[in-house]
């Protein structure tokens, strides 16, 4: 018999948090659901903890998959979806947890409102405090899509969203393998485009764990730059394919430049700063025209102006260096 919900949990080296995650899923007031874990080649005791913890809940439907080697989160999400039998899908990150009534509330709302996607608010757990973050659902598809692209009042994570299985399993919504940062943001944007109706529960039901953040989260390596470029390339292709790019150009271009600024602020080296200073150069000159879209953010505005000017100067210096080298090579 088809379960009403498939809860999908990819994990990799989460031994510190995964037991609490499993317990929160196992103790739901809702009962008609399956839980599928996927071990992406963990090298710690995560798999052992999963086996030991689920053994205490024999009445529930558990299954565990394993990749022979680390494949990345996009591959894992696709494999989990291929194995899921539920009418609805909920992804849960292995270092997070959910409220005991999350499945019940989201499912009841989805059914009563005929929603393809049902969204809850979030407990955002920081090292020193927990705050409630409100997700947003707009009145129109156009506004939902715009907000998902900008990721300002729409949270572009999957984990606070109950999603109709046939929606997220359609071929165009599969996760882009190789994109392992913002892979969920890209899919959420696609889901918001294809969804007939999105419902909202004004209650925090998901605990998003940010207490485990390491300094690498803040200090951006070359991998972060490459992943960012790939994300925007894939999003551009999707929007162009559906004749949406011109409609959302302002949102996309602002978000690209904002993304670049944040990467530059947190670059681990001057080499990276120089190497990627020309990133999105084709739209950088139009930044001032795009900035008023959220001009109230004065701090970001000033940071952007400084960093973009710095990138401009670096580009000039690099061109001058090439020019001098060419002259010397001719001698």
Where are these regions (language model features)?
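Catalytic core of nucleotide-sugar-dependent glycosyltransferases
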Residues: 203-211, 218-246, 258-288
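Nucleotide-sugar donor-binding/catalytic module of glycosyltransferases
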Residues: 1-231, 327
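Residues within HEAT/ARM-like alpha-solenoid scaffolds
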Residues: 247-255
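Membrane-interface aromatic/basic loop that binds lipid-linked glycans or pyrophosphate carriers
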Residues: 268-331
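Hydrophobic transmembrane alpha-helix bundles
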Residues: 77, 98, 102-106, 154-161, ...
